Amino acid sequence: MIPFNKPYLTGKEMQYIEDAVKSGKISGNGLFTKKCQEFFEKEFGFKKTLLTTSCTDALEMAAILADIKEGDEVIVPSFTFVSTALAFVRQGADIVFADSYSDNPNIDADQIEALITEKTKAIVVVHYAGVACDMDKIMSIANKHGIIVIEDAAQAIDSYYISKDGTKKALGSIGHLSAFSFHETKNIISGEGGMLCINDGRFIQRAEIIWEKGTNRSQFFRGEVDKYSWVDTGSSFLPSEIISAFLWAQIENMRDIQDKRIKIWNRYYEGLSSFEPVSIKKPKLPLVPEYATNNAHMFYLVCDNVDDRTKFIQHLKDKGILSVFHYLSLHKSSYYEKYSTRKSELPNSDMFSDCLVRLPLFYELTNEQVEYIINTIKEL
């Protein structure tokens, strides 16, 4: 069976983990944590980065920094992972779900402004498959209404937004705050792991305090205070040096990893462009808007209906290939229906929930396997 995902190891992970253990500093915020954070800040232009134990934790930190309180409204796309909404629900937010575009799963920026009320505190955008949302439009709306923008960039490492003036900005560097994932399904990994990026300077000091269990420990270690104490809310968000050491091995090979994934993505796109199935209607290829780049986090197809998708997945499974669907629309989840009185009609989110299917894409997927997958799909 060709798996959907296989975590890639560069060969340096165990060496760096051993180095971290031998250093005598493995509890977190040591050498490897600093190396990783400095790399991301320099490479992608983030003002401040803090590694976390997961992207969920990074989103929860963002919710605290945005000062989300009971009754505040937060606009979130419905077609996303539960953490995107849950991080804000935990702070008491009333989630207002937004629909996707009809031709790609990202939040429909043209629908956002109609969802804003006097209670709206934040807009959370998700760069699905590592492909940018329309950030110029979203930031313009947010700035007009004085609303914080948080980028859920879990899938978007090393992907960019291109403004109309040609300016190229890394995803995660545009909103006030952003969150990344290094889960084993992502392009670069640490098993579990994430990162909060702070692009608005007013949040940096408090972010460090929240990251360090509500203490000003970071300031103490920089010699800015003579002792540290409990000064704010927070939790134990920082990862151990073992996780950071693993991540550093991945970072060192990021360009090679990205180049290989993009090569696979491009071959899928080329090979399936002329696909004319007989047993199902022709699925749609992924859309990368002109303002976005592609980091090859995911290759998906959009079937015409749920029955076609079921037939597609079963056909590949019968041939030894694991393909998978993705999110169920959060506005239809049992938890949301229980806690919220809002009733939303989000047809595009529902369509992607019913029709989107993802193909295997990982570093060690061979050329022969890619061709086999393409040819197997063409048998439909």
What does each model-found stretch correspond to?
Residues 33-38, 43-49, 110, 122-126, ...:
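PLP-dependent aminotransferase class I/II
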Residues 62-116, 122-124:
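Conserved PLP-anchoring active-site segment centered on the Schiff-base-forming lysine
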Residues 103-190, 195-202, 358:
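Active-site phosphate-binding strand-loop segment of PLP-dependent enzymes
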Residues 91, 144-145, 319:
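Helix C-cap/helix->beta junction micro-motif
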Residues 26-73, 86-91, 97-98, 164:
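Phosphate-binding glycine-rich loop
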Residues 86-88, 141, 170, 242:
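Hydrophobic/aromatic ligand-binding patch that stacks against planar heteroaromatic rings
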Residues 1-26, 229-231, 360:
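N-terminal "arm"/small-domain region of PLP-dependent enzymes with the aminotransferase-like
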